[in-house]
């Protein structure tokens, strides 16, 4: 996957390209990240990238010319058909379904806003989709862009050692993840559930599914409203609820 970044602070993306799973993906050639700074396209000595909004009001907007030129440069450098995304609080809220949809694209350009945002005409003419990571405001689009890259890159074949890791994560099947345990077997008097040490793969699968359903019911019940549960899932959830109420 190729990702083009348009940002006033491209150095921030070193946390994506140099570290962790995404850093390894870059080293393996599975993920390529390039950046364009609108300051490099400014025409004045001060490299100005902000401008006053029409109608007055507090704050500034990103200047049209440097931003548009940076976007055009990123588009020209793209190796193929590219989806252009503007990270914005007004965009579609990113969730697991959205992540999987975006992962189908081979090339993405992510525009990171600053100040009070960008000229609406830039969005209308240059942007394919707007995405948000939540109903809150940040100082810029860089962290949302990094969040998007991190989540989408997990679905690039070869990025994760075991692709099942992505398929079994929270929200991958519409449910929260089940509890996980590692050594020691006993920690502060609390033991690892016996079923996980049994070696019975079917029992372990059912236990994990039950815990996943139960955790979703307890913490995010609204997620269950959008799911068509199988007979097995209905049975396991009923068992979990009964067990919880008898504790």
Curated annotation (Swiss-Prot):
GO terms for biological process: tRNA N1-guanine methylation. Its EC number is 2.1.1.228. Belongs to the RNA methyltransferase TrmD family. It catalyses: guanosine(37) in tRNA + S-adenosyl-L-methionine = N(1)-methylguanosine(37) in tRNA + S-adenosyl-L-homocysteine + H(+). Homodimer. PANTHER family: TRNA (GUANINE-N(1)-)-METHYLTRANSFERASE. This is tRNA (guanine-N(1)-)-methyltransferase. Keywords: Cytoplasm, Methyltransferase, S-adenosyl-L-methionine, Transferase, tRNA processing. It comes from the Bacteria. Its main location: cytoplasm. GO terms for cellular component: cytosol. NCBIfam families: PRK00026.1, trmD. The keyword Nucleotidyltransferase does not apply. It is found in: Cytoplasm. GO terms for molecular function: tRNA (guanine(37)-N1)-methyltransferase activity. Specifically methylates guanosine-37 in various tRNAs.
């Amino acid at each position: 996957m190729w990702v083009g970044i348009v940002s006033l602070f491209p150095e921030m993306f070193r946390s994506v390209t140099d570290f962790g799973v995404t850093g390894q993906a870059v080293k393996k050639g599975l993920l390529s990240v390039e950046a364009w700074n609108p300051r490099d396209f400014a025409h004045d000595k001060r490299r100005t990238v902000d401008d006053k909004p029409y109608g007055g009001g507090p704050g500034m907007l990103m200047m049209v010319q440097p931003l548009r030129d940076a976007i055009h440069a990123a588009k020209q450098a793209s190796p193929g058909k590219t989806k252009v995304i503007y990270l914005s609080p007004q965009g579609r809220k990113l969730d697991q379904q959205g992540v999987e949809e975006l992962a189908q694209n081979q090339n993405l350009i992510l525009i990171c806003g600053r100040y009070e945002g960008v000229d609406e005409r830039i969005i209308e003419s240059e942007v394919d989709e707007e995405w948000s990571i939540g109903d809150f405001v940040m100082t810029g689009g860089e962290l949302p862009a990094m969040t998007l890259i991190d989540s989408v890159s997990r679905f690039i074949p070869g990025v994760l050692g075991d692709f099942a890791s992505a398929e079994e994560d929270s929200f991958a099947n519409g449910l929260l993840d089940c509890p996980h345990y590692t050594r020691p077997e006993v920690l502060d008097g609390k033991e690892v559930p016996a079923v996980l040490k049994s070696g019975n793969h079917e029992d372990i699968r059912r236990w994990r599914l039950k815990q996943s359903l139960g955790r979703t019911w307890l913490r995010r019940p609204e997620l269950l409203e959008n799911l068509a549960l199988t007979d097995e899932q209905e049975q396991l959830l009923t068992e979990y609820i009964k067990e919880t109420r008898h504790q």
